[in-house]
Amino acid sequence: QGEKIELRSSGIINAATAMAVLRAAVGFMTFLLAFEFRGGEEGVPMEGTGRASGVATGLIRDQDILGTPGAPVWHYGAVLACASGGALLGARMAPRLRMLMVEERIISGVLFIAFAGTVSASWLPSISGAMVVSLLLAGSAGSAKLAFDSLVQRDAPDANHGRSFALFEGRFQLSWAFGSLIALLIAMLPIQVGYFTMALGVGLGLVFYLPRTREARKAQKIITPEEPQKPDGQLGFWTRSTEEEN
């Protein structure tokens, strides 16, 4: 019973909602860019014997005899490289940010970065916008996940963390699937519409999260334990002082 109460605290629920928004945005981005840079269709073969008849048959059947060019292969490589780099950067920066600020600030900060990235992508050329949004969104989602895990351990110290993380991760995966479904529904629209939709969703998540964590985001000192506080010799969880930083 105590575990359920801890896991249903407002801080954890609000952070889980923000994390679900970011995961949905990642799923949306994945399918949006997959459709944007998909390959083209081959036209009617026009070489060798029967070239003229093949072209004529294609015209009669109202087929595209020339085909539609797909995105260059290096576009995929550039977007994937940015997404991978963003994920690595987020995993690298989150522990360092945790030493400087509380988890609520990290989550709100990466929400803002993801929102700014999706808005700016709509004004950039296709490949440049895709690279920017994949880099910033992957990094934001990675940092937010580590901050969320830390927040759960901080606010629910007596909970079964393995089971709790598995439960939340399952919900986040459903959010990812929901985001990808939305991308499928608007796949035939211009990619700028997709960026606008993504920015709208992340922006709503930011508007939801900020007012509900105003008190928790106040500047407070991070107290790092230096002596073992557990029977197995492990250090205790980082806590926050009630004194504000100057």
How does the language model describe each region?
Residues Q1-A24, E226-E245:
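Juxtamembrane intracellular "pre-TM" segments in multi-pass secondary transporters
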Residues A121, F196-T239, E245:
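Multi-pass alpha-helical transporter architecture, strongest
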Residues V73, E104, D158-F168:
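Loop-to-transmembrane helix entry/capping segments in MFS-fold secondary transporters
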Residues S120-S134:
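Helix-loop junctions at membrane interfaces in 12-TM secondary transporters
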Residues R105-V119, A199:
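Structural signature of the two symmetry-related core transmembrane helices
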Residues K4-L89:
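A single, central transmembrane helix in multi-pass transporters
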Residues L33, S143-A156:
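Intracellular juxtamembrane helix-capping segments at the cytosolic ends
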